[in-house]
UniProtKB/Swiss-Prot annotation:
Its main location: membrane. The lineage of its organism: Bacteria, Pseudomonadati, Spirochaetota, Spirochaetia, Spirochaetales. Keywords: Membrane, Transmembrane, Transmembrane helix. This is Uncharacterized protein TP_1014. Residues 586-603 have a biased composition (Basic and acidic residues). The chain crosses the membrane at residues 16-38. InterPro entries: TPR-like_helical_dom_sf (IPR011990). Gene3D superfamilies: Tetratricopeptide repeat domain.
Amino acid sequence: MVCSITLLKVRSKRHLLSYLGVVGVGIAGLCIYRSVWGSRPFLERLARADSLIAQERKGAALRGLARMVGHARESSQYLSIAKRQMELSASAAALRTLQRGIRRSADDGRLAALVIHLLLREARFEEAISYVPRVVHKGYESIGAEALIKAALIGSRTGGDSPSRGSFHSERAEHVPEEPVEFSQVQGGRDQAHVTAFPLDRGEEQFRVEPSPPIRHTTGIALARIAPALWLAAFGVTGMHAFLQNAACAYARVGELHAAFRLYSRILGTEAPENTAFWATVAYDAGQFSLVFELLPISLARADLFGTYSAASTHARTHLLLAADAAFDGGDRARARAFWYAYVDRFPGTSTHALYNLALTAPHAQERVRMLAQCVEGDKTYYPAVACYARESIAFRAAHRQRDSVTELLSERGVYSVQMEQEHFLSPHFPVEARSLLAELAQEAMHGRADVRFALEYFRFCYPAQKRLQGSRGALWQLLEVFPVDTQVRRYARWFFFRIGEYESAFGLSDAGGGPEDAFYRALAAASRTGRVESILGGLVEATRAVEARSAAFANIAIVLERMGKKTAAAEHFVLAADEATRESVRQLQKEAGEGEAEEHPRARPAAGKAQRWREWYQRAGQLLQQQGKTVAARALLQRAQAR
């Protein structure tokens, strides 16, 4: 009995194993069948749908295709169904099919590209751009670019902000600002310099060679935050240079200037760029000056071909000024002046900037005044030229008054030495009377029709420049009454009152636009009320944040520390003040004045005046260290003061 039971168990196990083996073989066979023949029912249904389409049985074909969607497993199957639905003009059904396919195969760019195509056909731009990230780096970037561009076009026409969502950001584009990008618009590293004068020594102004304005060739189309990859894809498909230029803009806007410049190499060597001035600007911003000069003949030739009022002429004007900037920045002043002269000859009606730059780089006073006079006669509202012209007039009169009596007597008798003849023939001629010009412009400014700086310049011409204080307080208070909240007027008035010892009036103007200088004057006012000199230190430290006031702030901190008996700290701050002033003015002289021109160049005079301050500050620091017994450091500073 026991033996029979054991035998039964063994047989049961054998039957079970045999059964499991048969089931396993069946499952494997089914898997192989599905992998090899599983698509045959789908292909048969697809053939049936094609037959119905051929028989023009549209309704039956669409119903069959709709049922097939539930049996589709691969992205190619969804594409096959959607293609036939589109052929039957059932775009809505095709869109649903593709969207279902995307949910199943999210990484297939073909499905998203076809969805974008369908949505663009129906002008559903906001929905289309939401699919753009799915086509990038999938070989379908061009359709994504088309969606973003069309959305931006519609947004600009309707006053909207499209694309408002879904604008694709690549690894670079995620830093692109919210402002719109415009067709062929350069956003380079240089600011447009409408104002070229800035405060120097609290009331004096220094002038600089003016850079050309950045190129702006726009069509008024707001194209926001589109990634460079999309622009490049559009360029690859169409070959249109505008797309390549906008890719360069996208890189430039996030500071990738060299990446923007490298895009120029995509233009074939046998093909000239459509906008040479654009690529010249990109090259300038990337520091590649050679391309600026290389493309200039093309810009000028196109301007000659298409005429004065063409876009090519506008590009040529910008390009010529840009070439002058590149030459000047490269240290070739003669070449820069040649470009500015060429600009004046070619475009005489728009040559204010070029004439002004020629004046600042002129080799002698006569040439400088002649260029300034042309500039003023062409545009008397251009403040930098008018201010320089007036100051040259003041300097010439002051020099003429200093002539000795013997020279005056000889000139009256008609007797001239070689030096007198040279001075006579090189003396500047002022065709416009500076005082009357400034008086006219000051009146215009008082009525809000001209730059307020003309009113300040006229005040400076009448009082500080003439070393005359009588009536100056009343004239300045009159300006403050006309311009009670103007920052420039309040700052100048505060400086002037301090200069003449009207401290209470200066303290009353402590609020002049905010910033470190206001903190400095508030600290002075507090110190004058409390009598504690150390209370001024906080304001002075804050004033060091302003670049133009840094050397003066360090010097004032040193003076306060010396009064407090902290001589070592005072010496350190005197050195900081001298070093800061040295860096600022030496750079200025090296760039703006060539060898042998220091006395002639308008920027050399204030810089030369600062040299005395350097010596005084280094010398005072050395004296303080000597008092502390630090003879080695003191001797080094005193030698530095003598060397400069």
